[in-house]
Structure formats: structure tokens, C-alpha cells
Amino acid sequence: MAVWAIGDVHGCRELLEGLWEEISPGPGDTVVLLGDLIDRGPDPAGVLWFVRERARTGRVVALRGNHEDLCLRWHRARSEADRGLWMANAGYTTLESYGFAPGDPAAELPAEDLAFLQAMPLWHREEGVVFVHAGLRPGVPLEEQDPEDLLWIRDEFYRHPEAFRERIVFGHTPFRRVLRNGPLVGIDTGAVYGGCLTAYEPFEERVVQVGAEDGGRFAW
């Protein structure tokens, strides 16, 4: 039974579909998406639909990323300043994928997709491996981590592998290739920026990638 982690998708539905076909998860397998399914790319709405449909019939864990969190805050916001933060982080691309024009006051995610985002956990642990969007604050137990760190932390986390014993698989910070730094494995390889969308199986150390620009598929 495999456990596949998938890095930041950012609206790249075609890449996600291609990668899913490559890893071909079976009935006993688990797929953990590390957050940031939405924003920036061409089809955030399609990505959410694709993941929701697979979650109905298979073991799929979709973690909350900082972009999902910004989206939820936008839907709760009461001031224009609060609402502007998601737009400044490419939230408009998600609304446009649902057919809303920029600035449409009626724009919002469908109730089913909004509920899906609200139910996303901040982390997942599977057989001693921790999966999280951005990372962990060194010296703080997993259960006591600040949600802001789980969603946003960068250098203070991945530059300090000596602070962690468990394998931690994370996204959020894009790298040209999979980052292996002690027990830390970063698999956001910048799909939406012309890189690859990466799937990683930590128990067998398998990596499968679908290339954004040339359609190439790589596995090792």
C-alpha cells in the first residue's frame, strides 16, 4: 500500500490528471495533497472538482495551504483591506475559473467547494511520516504548532533539519528539484512556474514527476 504526497498544484489541472495517471493509486493507497490546490494556474475550479471526486472513492487527504486559508479568510472578511490580501496573492485567478469577472461583487466559491476547503486539515501523519504544507517551527511539538507556521514558514524550518527526527514532507517553497535535507523533503517543484508537478512516496523513496513545459514524465 503506497502513500503518495503531491506538491503544490496551483490550478494546473492537466498536470494533476497526468500525474494521477502516472502514480495510478490503487484501492489500498493513500494520496496526500500538500495544499495550494488553487490560485495562479489556469483551472483552480477544475482542480478542486478533480480532487473532490477522487476523495469520494479513494483515500485522499487534501491539506490546507496558505492559499486555501487566504480564500477562506476572504469569504469571511468584512473590510476591503482584509479582502484584498487574497486578491494580491492571485485569488482572482480562482474566481475567474468559476466564471466571475474581476471585481464582481457576487463572486464566491460554490458551497460544496467552500465546505471542502473548510474541512481541510493542517497536517497529516502516516506511519511516522508528517505531511504539512509549509513546515514546522523547530522545538514545538506537532500538536502545538501555530497554524500560521504550518501554512507560511520557510527558512526557519527547512534550513534546520537537525531539529527534527521524523520524516517531514512539505510543499509551499518551490525548488528546482526535490529538496532532501536530512529528514526534510520538499516537493514543491514549481509546476505553475514552468517546473514539474511532483509526487513522492516516502516509504519506497519513489519520485514521479510530470513536466509543465515539455510534457515529459520522469520517475526514479
Question: Where in the sequence are the language-model features?
Answer:
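Divalent metal-coordination and catalytic microenvironments
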Residues: 8, 36, 51, 65-66, ...
